[in-house]
């Protein structure tokens, strides 16, 4: 028994593998994070030192569609070659040339932003003043193609003027004097127009009519604005429209057609009015050279055989 062989027991032990390589993966993630942070602060620094003109060019670059860039459409630059230009030969026009931003379009956007801010200021003024808040149904403020339009509308229960005259009622006076200082906040000029209903005068169009009444009411509104503090020279035009531009489809004699329209003009509308009333630079027709008339040559014709 002592010489009996005992079975050999083999024990396999797994050696613990070193995780040194895995433990260093955080360094890669940290390096990526630091690279991203460096790129972020680099972009912020470049934005802070860039001029407004350069910022506009950068924005236009990122707004350029990929299809436009591939097909060679209108890009941020007008160069004939995608390769940046260089060299000492200034007579060559090929190469990358900076495209100037559309200054006129930028001015229009800024002006539109000013008009929207003015509308917000007027709404805030109306809401903050209990007296004006009660008159909110008589005010209509909207943005139109010519600028910001403020309409003060009449009603049967509360007219703006005394019947058939240009005497301003107290509530109308309060509105005009309250909005006058707000209008001084922007450089845009103003056009005032008076409107009436279609109810005719007994004397007809030959005497005092709705034309005179609408013009007188518009001018009376101008005076109240000046009393309220409107800057001199702010008003560009005062016109009377009579009943030619109805506001409501309920009838030509509806009370809402009696109104004062105050238009804060944008630059384009202002230039159109100035051009309309400017002295014409064209030469009179009599001063123009007469076109030369080619000499007429008479050609004998053959007599027709039969009348048709």
Swiss-Prot record:
Keyword annotations: Cell inner membrane, Cell membrane, Chemotaxis, Flagellar rotation, Membrane, Signal-anchor, Transmembrane, Transmembrane helix
Gene3D superfamilies from the UniProt entry: OmpA-like domain
Outcome following mutation: residue 242 to T/V: Complete loss of motility
Cytoplasmic topological domain: 1-27
Membrane protein topology class: Single-pass type II membrane protein
Residues of the OmpA-like domain: 148-268
One annotated GO biological process: chemotaxis
Biased composition range(s): Polar residues: 90-101
Positions in the Periplasmic compartment: 50-308
Subcellular location: Cell inner membrane
Transmembrane in keyword set: yes
Region (Disordered): 73-101, 277-308
Entry superkingdom: Bacteria
Membrane-spanning residues: 28-49
Entry-linked Pfam families: MotB_plug, OmpA
PROSITE patterns xrefs: OMPA_2
Impact noted for substituting residue 39 to V: Complete loss of motility
GO cellular component, one term: plasma membrane
Signal peptide: none
Quaternary structure (record): Each stator complex is composed of 4 MotA and 2 MotB subunits; in E.coli 11 to 12 stator complexes can be involved in flagellar rotation. 2 A subunits and 1 B subunit are thought to form a single ion channel, so that each stator complex contains two channels.
Function: MotA and MotB comprise the stator element of the flagellar motor complex. Required for the rotation of the flagellar motor. Probably a linker that fastens the torque-generating machinery to the cell wall. Overexpression of this protein with MotA improves motility in a pdeH disruption, (a c-di-GMP phosphodiesterase) suggesting there is an interaction (direct or indirect) between the c-di-GMP-binding flagellar brake protein YcgR and the flagellar stator.
Similarity annotation: Belongs to the MotB family.
Name by which UniProt lists this protein: Motility protein B
Organism: Escherichia coli (strain K12)
